[in-house]
Every structure is written in structure tokens, then in C-alpha cells.
Amino acid sequence: MLSFLREFVDVVVLSVPGMVVLGLIGGSFLNVVIHRTPTIAERDQWEQASLLMSDPQAWSLAFPDLAAPSVAVDAAAADIQGALAKSGPYTLSQPGSACPKCSRRIRWYENVPLLSWLWLRRRCSGCGSPISWRYPAVEVTVAMIFAWFAWRLGPVPAAPMWAAVCCALLALAVIDAQTALLPDRLTQALLWAGLAAAALGWSWVGAPLAVTGAAFGYLVPWLCDVAMRRYLALPAMAAGDFQLLAAIGAWLGQPVLVAAILVVAIFTALPAALLRLRRDGPAASAAPFGPYLAAPAILVVLVGPAAVYDVLR
């Protein structure tokens, strides 16, 4: 029985067609992650704020120079907690998917990756509002990523693992581009998964190099940011960028790869930042840096970290 299951996984699931199907399903889930994770992170922040406002001990630790929370602060905390409770649980699985325009629940047969979008003629079956092209675009992109690794690596467990790494980076890039947010849930999960994969011998580097890459990925941009803030009074990057590069370092291991990704990201982001500054002047807001880090990292993973390292060495 075990040999049959192993052969089924190798011949069917990990084949190129099987990985395409797996990628379409993964792309559908990735759309949920991209859409819901920022809201989940925002709800977490509101919940933490309400707990801080309603707990005198936590308030005194956070604001030692201020008096205990006033009646108005307590009332605001109660309002926040009430609003969160009234809206119900909000996770990757709850509530069920619904049309953002008419709030009509999406039936299971309307949620089949790519096919439902084509069958519904790109419109909601309830209100007729157009369904964004982003959803099938993500599904097709993820399917192509899974197919690429199935073709390049063959029917091995490493193929879906590295495809999942690319998908996580893709999700972080899209979220940061849309919301200027790199959720800790995703960056930290990617970081710890990279360290665990190295420790278990699943990655292309061992645990010591994975730890080195993660530390290098966090400390170098953090030191750049400290220097920029101190000498130029300008922030270089945010904490989410440090965590993202640390996660990339955990998977790639070699500091030279992490450094190359950072250099490419800086040189590609700089022209966009200068154009933004020229257009908007001093009022220009900082552009999200996550996509500039994620894009070269995805390219390195697609080509193969070992191959890129041999070129750079």
C-alpha cells in the first residue's frame, strides 16, 4: 500500500500535469492569503490596542509617564472589542468567500480555480459585477511556478517545497505593493520554515549557513537603516523589510546571495524613489520595498541558488 501511494505521488502528483493542478489549487489559496492577511493583521493591531487600553498594568508599562487609562479610554477599548466581536471571526477559512460588491456567498462550483472565472464570464453570478483579473492571474502564475519546478527538479518533494517558497514571496510582494505592509505572520513563518528545512536537510544549505544567511539578511539592512536615520535623518527600510530579507537569507544561506539580492533591490528601487520624489517633492511617501526584495529572490530560487552562487563566487 505504501509503495503504491509513493508511486502515485511520484507519477501523478509530482508530474508536470499534477503540479499544474496543484499550482492552480495553491494559487486559489494564495489569493485568499493576499486578500485576507492584511485585514487579519489590522484586526490583530486593534485587538492589541484595546487590550492595552483596558489593562492598567499594560498601560503603565507602555506609557510610564501617563496616568492610568481614563474613562474615555476604557470606553473606546470597549467599543473596539465590541466591534470586533460583532464582526465575528475573520481568518483564512472564516467567513466563507463572498462577492465584495453584493456580499453573496460564493458556491463551491463557482470557486474552482480558473475554470469558474471563465465559466462565469468574469462576472459575479449574483450582481453581475466584474471579477478582478488578478485572481486568475495569480492562479496561472502559481501553476506555472509549480510546473517549472516539476520540470527542473523532477518528481521529488523538493519541487513543491521550492514552489511554495516562491509563492510565499509572491504573496508578500503583492501585499506590500497594495498595502505597504509586510505581515509578521508571513515573514516570520517563511523565516522559521527556512531554518526548519535546513535543519531537516531539505534545503540546499545546512542549518549553520541558514542561520548565517538569516542573521546577515536582518542585520545588514538594519545597520543601513540606523546609519540613514542617524546621519541623513531619513528612514531607509522598515522592520518588515528586515524580516523579509532574513527569511530570504534562511532559505538561500550564502551571504553573497543575500547581498546580491539587496544590491539589486536598491538599484531597482532607487530610480522609482527618485521619480516619486521629483513628482511629489518633500511630501512624497516611501514606496514599498518588499517587491524589490522579493522579485530577485524569486528569480534566484527559480534558476537555482546553487547555480547563481557558482556565478557570483
Annotate each predicted stretch with a short phrase.
Residues 103-158, 162, 240-241, 246-248:
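Multi-pass membrane catalytic core of lipid/isoprenoid biosynthesis enzymes
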